């Protein structure tokens, strides 16, 4: 459950390390974002000489949350940290690698690239 001002780890090699949610996209007064939702983020911490710089604003998709996601069989998949993958204007990932596991809920037409790059799909 991500809302405005939430900080997230970055799960790709775009160069950003920490980002802060500045808007939850999808609806006029939408408050929370979960796994698979697109948010607008600002880069708060980045590595030197990388594509993403501190202060840059990007779209991102949430790939891991502490709140988790409930499956139809009743099981819940939760993670230790909140994480997102930075996206370009065409909603394609900026990085070429994904770090850490992602969930099956990302397996739709928009995010198949992220699922195929991920080392583990839960």
Swiss-Prot record:
PROSITE patterns documented for this protein: RIBOSOMAL_L14 (PS00049)
Record keywords, A-Z: Ribonucleoprotein, Ribosomal protein, RNA-binding, rRNA-binding
GO CC, one annotated term: cytosolic large ribosomal subunit
GO MF term list: large ribosomal subunit rRNA binding; structural constituent of ribosome
Gene Ontology terms: biological process: translation
Keyword Ribosomal protein found: yes
Annotated InterPro entries: Ribosomal_uL14 (IPR000218), Ribosomal_uL14_bac-type (IPR005745), Ribosomal_uL14_CS (IPR019972), Ribosomal_uL14_sf (IPR036853)
Pfam families the record matches: Ribosomal_L14
Matches recorded under NCBIfam families: rplN_bact
Family classification: Belongs to the universal ribosomal protein uL14 family.
Function as written in the Swiss-Prot or TrEMBL entry: Binds to 23S rRNA. Forms part of two intersubunit bridges in the 70S ribosome.
Subunit-level organization: Part of the 50S ribosomal subunit. Forms a cluster with proteins L3 and L19. In the 70S ribosome, L14 and L19 interact and together make contacts with the 16S rRNA in bridges B5 and B8.
Name of the protein described by the UniProt record: Large ribosomal subunit protein uL14
């Amino acid at each position: 459950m991500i809302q405005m001002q939430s900080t997230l780890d970055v799960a790709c090699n775009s160069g950003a390390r920490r980002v802060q949610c500045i808007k939850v996209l999808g609806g006029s007064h939408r408050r929370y974002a979960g796994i698979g939702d697109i948010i607008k983020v600002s880069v708060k911490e980045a590595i030197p000489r990388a594509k993403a710089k501190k202060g840059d604003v990007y779209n991102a998709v949430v790939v891991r949350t502490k709140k988790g996601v409930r499956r139809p069989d009743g099981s819940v998949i939760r993670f230790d940290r909140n994480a997102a993958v930075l996206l370009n204007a065409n909603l394609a990932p900026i990085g070429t690698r994904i770090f850490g596991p992602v969930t099956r809920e990302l397996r739709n037409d928009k995010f198949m690239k992220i699922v195929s790059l991920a080392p583990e799909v839960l």
